[in-house]
Swiss-Prot record:
Family assignment from sequence similarity: Belongs to the bacterial/plant glucose-1-phosphate adenylyltransferase family.
Protein name: Glucose-1-phosphate adenylyltransferase
Annotated alpha-D-glucose 1-phosphate binding sites: 112, 178, 193-194, 211
EC number: 2.7.7.27
Keyword Transmembrane assigned: no
UniProt cross-references to Pfam families, sorted A to Z: Hexapep_GlmU, NTP_transferase
Functional description taken from the UniProt entry: Involved in the biosynthesis of ADP-glucose, a building block required for the elongation reactions to produce glycogen. Catalyzes the reaction between ATP and alpha-D-glucose 1-phosphate (G1P) to produce pyrophosphate and ADP-Glc.
UniProt subunit comment: Homotetramer.
Primary enzyme class: transferase
Entry superkingdom: Bacteria
Keywords: ATP-binding, Carbohydrate metabolism, Glycogen biosynthesis, Glycogen metabolism, Nucleotide-binding, Nucleotidyltransferase, Transferase
Amino acid sequence: MNNAVLNQPNKYDLVKDTLVLILAGGRGSRLHELTDKRAKPALYFGGNRRIIDFALSNCINSGLNRIGVITQYAAHSLLRHLQTGWSFLPQERGEFVDMLPARQQIDDNTWYRGTADSVYQNLAIIRGHYKPKYVLILAGDHIYKMDYSQMLLDHVSSGAKCTVGCIEVPREEAKEFGVMAVNETLKVKAFVEKPQDPPAMIGKPNSSLASMGIYVFNADYLYEALDRIKTPNTSHDFGKDVMPLALNDGVLYAHPFDRSCKGRNTEGAIYWKDVGTLDSFWQANIDLVSEEPQLDIYDQTWPIRGNPVQAYPSKFFYDEPNCKQVDNSLIAGGCMVKNASISYSVLFDNVSVNAGSSIEQSVILPQVKIGKNCMLRRCIIDRHVQIPDGMQIGVDLELDSKRFRISKNGIVLVTESMLHKLNGKSVASEAHLD
């Protein structure tokens, strides 16, 4: 047998020797009030999932069953979701989804100071308990489908000590990401974090090669790198500190996302979204209602698991002639719609829409009640909101700007506290669990 074949890394051994760490402590400040009470990875998405379900499902589908989720900001709903929806792995076989909340292990006066510090503060557990050969580090707040085992194979085959996932993005958007340049072997030759003037790809003046915030490390090199950047004058961040270090050491390689993207549509397009703003969150949800969306959430070959609410079937009641009904929308379980119009929208579980109301291009989170004769257009309605009879949202943006929050692209966010203030009620009366 060919020696090159004999020396190829074994996928089963690689995933068995790998620990996954999902960074899920971020607040998501650009989502404003939508993440006031929940971490960004715990935010609802696609009718009956949460954002973190994509990273977790990618792990399970890739054969990676040793997972730690690092949490910090507003973690209660995220921890409950992990406990109720992701506790099915058999621990007797060494498989788990463990929760690693911020516990101020190194310094009693500080929480995690950055993405790299969140891993550094858990090194005692990682080294002493998990003892991995490789560590895969993921952001818990992106929407995509990816076979991480392919990235692991590429990492080992290249001889890298650190591999970063990358994707081609429009140059004007690249200032929000780490941007790199690579040679013909995919060795990274330059890396800059969130540049104001992103460098273009060779031969593609309008595109940049952006970091996806996905990293594979040889465990020993990760420990060494984290120890080297723990000085007070660093940002304790993978993009700002660890990537430049690996670049200078000559051990940093790139993994193009199109090598491991799963669930492409009929046109072969790849899909990866950072839903870090109100506009991108709204758009990513609305994208799902098209006939052939770029992201196929119905694909059973690469399923996105979660913890769907056990609800009764949704009910649609129409007894008025010429009443426009429901078209091009996603409707989760437990919804009640009576003589109302819904188009190009996403309704999460247990939403009620009363007679005469119209919903267009909107994202309605769980347990929202919409009164009679309401008009909702291009808006995001947060969980538990009760829209009073006759209210119009998204129709007069000048009026909405005095009551709610309006995004750069004119999407209106409505939360329970905003309506309470509008009605003169005490915001402190809110006591819902997310």
